[in-house]
């Protein structure tokens, strides 16, 4: 039974998305339908969590908007409404859930960039 479920889910999973992890700064291009208009809305911020597996996987992106108001948005990872995901920076973190960033403001909310040797693969 599990093999049947896994094979059906495999059809709906996307393979065109780049690998990213919590702490990375990403720009998600999300298709928004307003009335009859369809437009692509970019949302840029830090990934504070990834959860789930298979087609149910989601990730949450946090950014600080105008006047210091934090905005978090949760996206289904395999949604057909996601046009593309750009990884802008790889953050150096030691946690899977970065909820502590909610209490931090300004420079305290910055994350160090994860460095890597030239030519190596970065997860």
Swiss-Prot record:
Keyword Ribonucleoprotein attributed: yes
UniProt superkingdom: Bacteria
Pfam families: Ribosomal_L19
InterPro entries per UniProt: Ribosomal_bL19 (IPR001857), Ribosomal_bL19_CS (IPR018257), Ribosomal_bL19_sf (IPR038657), Translation_prot_SH3-like_sf (IPR008991)
Keywords, comma-separated and alphabetical: Ribonucleoprotein, Ribosomal protein
Keyword match Ribonucleoprotein: yes
GO annotation, cellular component aspect: cytosolic large ribosomal subunit
Gene Ontology molecular function, alphabetical: structural constituent of ribosome
Gene Ontology terms: biological process: translation
Gene3D superfamilies: 2.30.30.790
Family to which the UniProt record says this protein belongs: Belongs to the bacterial ribosomal protein bL19 family.
Purpose: This protein is located at the 30S-50S ribosomal subunit interface and may play a role in the structure and function of the aminoacyl-tRNA binding site.
Protein name, entry field: Large ribosomal subunit protein bL19
Protein's organism: Thermomicrobium roseum (strain ATCC 27502 / DSM 5159 / P-2)
Organism lineage: Bacteria, Pseudomonadati, Thermomicrobiota, Thermomicrobia, Thermomicrobiales
Recorded name of the encoding gene: rplS
């Amino acid at each position: 039974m599990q093999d049947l479920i896994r094979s059906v889910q495999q059809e709906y999973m996307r393979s065109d998305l780049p690998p990213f992890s919590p702490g990375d700064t990403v720009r998600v291009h999300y298709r928004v339908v307003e009335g009859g208009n369809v437009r692509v809305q970019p949302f840029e911020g830090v990934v504070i969590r990834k959860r789930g597996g298979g087609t149910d996987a989601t990730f949450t992106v946090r950014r600080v908007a105008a006047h210091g108001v934090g905005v978090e948005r949760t996206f289904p990872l395999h949604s057909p409404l996601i046009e593309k995901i750009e990884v802008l920076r790889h953050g150096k973190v030691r946690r899977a859930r970065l909820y502590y960033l909610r209490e931090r403001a300004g420079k305290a909310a910055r994350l160090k960039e994860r460095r890597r040797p030239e030519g190596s693969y970065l997860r």
